[in-house]
Amino acid sequence: MSILIAFALAVLRLTGFFIEPRLSDADIHAVSGEPARVMWPLSTERPLTVVTWNIERGARFDRVAAMLGEVDADVILLQEADRFCSRSGDRDVARDLAIQLQMNYVIAGEFQEVGEGRRDQPCVSGQAILSRMPIEDAIAVRFADQASLKWRLNPAQPRRGGRIALRARTGGTVFYSVHLESGADETLRAKQVGDILSDVPAGREPVIIGGDFNNVGGPASPMFAGLRAAGFGNAMIDTASERPMARRPIDWIFTRHIIARAEVIRAADASDHDPIVATASVQRRF
């Protein structure tokens, strides 16, 4: 039965492959959303709760929404958020989460997943930022170095576009929702981190970088050296043991000019990644 289901899904995607229009990279990476739909009365003295989570396309939407509702975050950084893809119920996942959680949101596509959309609505998956506060200055940072994989020719996952980080400003803090390349080595991922650091504003403005880094080297990864040199601290380090809190972690939160401590929340039934929840407060003395 599973073979028949897999065959049927392959036929459906192949059909979509021939009818779905191809988007340009500019269209795929374009930022959209509702950045100022709501405004929560938040105190400036209250610590900020930030979540980063690769939601595996949002295919298990109800479970993802329930988990985020329990966490009650002020800012949410999402990776692999689908828009109008058959594999995730043709939802605009970030928009639907923002509505359900009563938050503002912006999203930028990473890849067009060819064959998962429709003739009138191509499927795009990418990074999103949700916030209880208005969102400003949102842009997609497309990495200069991409994997050498020929995604457009991959019969198992035909796609267009390239890896990006989504940057936005909300609540007086600059956020990056990051998804680094999985089909490459640590050297390429370190270069992608360098692209993010080149985009980080100069000065004392608080910055939080969170997401799926796809690293295999743990704290020894070359990308960490660049982040440390740029003044970023790793919120995922347990200061009591100085060891990463998650075993073999690939999801991280890094901060500059803001103090944060993060923990992993188990959510195996909602995604193939667990969400990371950080409590952050702005440094008063620089």
Predicted segment positions?
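Active-site regions of metal-assisted phosphoester/phosphodiester hydrolases
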Residues: M1-V75, R83-F84, I99, N104-F286
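Short, flexible, glycine-rich and Lys/Arg-enriched loop motifs at helix boundaries
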Residues: S88-G89
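Active-site phosphate/pyrophosphate- and oxyanion-stabilizing loops and adjacent acidic/basic residues
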Residues: R95
